[in-house]
Design a protein with these regions (language model features):
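Gly/Ser-rich, acidic/histidine-flanked active-site/gating loops
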Residues: 185
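Thiamine diphosphate
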Residues: 1-164, 168-177, 182
Length: 185
């Protein structure tokens, strides 16, 4: 099995570098979300909001209103728990084309309970107009930007980071399922 180191870093840069309407939004987790290289090479397309997730959601909603497509980067738990009201009012209800890249989904984080996004799917699925996508391997991480950007409305992506195994040959496609194995029951 092939292991791919930081697949999102290259995939996001390749996807966003020539699209002026796509902006990279960061919650002060550039390296942890694998966007530090993009920040360094495309500073005119990079906005650091600091550890101000509530402001980041409202600001990104405004960017969406102005015709931009913000790709918001943070740990999953920080994209919905604290900024919930702003996420609902500025992004979900008005159906802004914001792409929320939530890294360290579930209990994959070494940061303890404050960093665990254990209810993110249930919270995000209850929001109007919100689509939730899940990455399962390096191929899906590499194709998540295109998949998310194909949706007319807000998208929350559960992101893998670091060294990620490659399990699938074909990219993630919205609305298509994968058969992992055939059963007989």
């Amino acid at each position: 099995m092939e292991i791919v180191n930081k697949p999102y870093s290259k995939a996001f840069e390749d996807f966003a570098k020539d699209k002026e309407e796509i902006l990279c939004i960061s919650a002060d987790l550039d390296s942890s979300c694998e966007i530090d290289g993009f920040r360094d090479r495309y500073p005119h397309k990079f906005i650091s909001m600091g550890m101000a997730e509530q402001n980041m959601m409202s600001f990104s909603g405004g960017l969406g209103l102005a015709g931009f497509r913000p790709f918001i980067h943070s740990f999953g738990v920080f994209t919905y728990r604290r900024p919930y009201d702003q996420l609902v009012a500025s992004i979900a209800y008005p159906r802004r084309k914001a792409r929320i890249m939530g890294f360290l989904p579930g209990i994959t984080t070494p940061g303890g309970m404050t960093h665990q996004a254990i209810e993110d799917i249930s919270v995000m699925r209850t929001l109007p107009n919100m689509t939730v996508l899940e990455t399962g391997d390096a191929t899906e991480v590499e194709s998540i930007c295109e998949a998310a950007d194909s949706i007319d409305g807000p998208v929350y992506c559960r992101m893998l980071r670091g060294s990620v195994p490659r399990l699938f040959e074909s990219p993630l496609k919205v609305g298509e399922l994968r058969t992992l194995s055939e059963g007989e029951d």
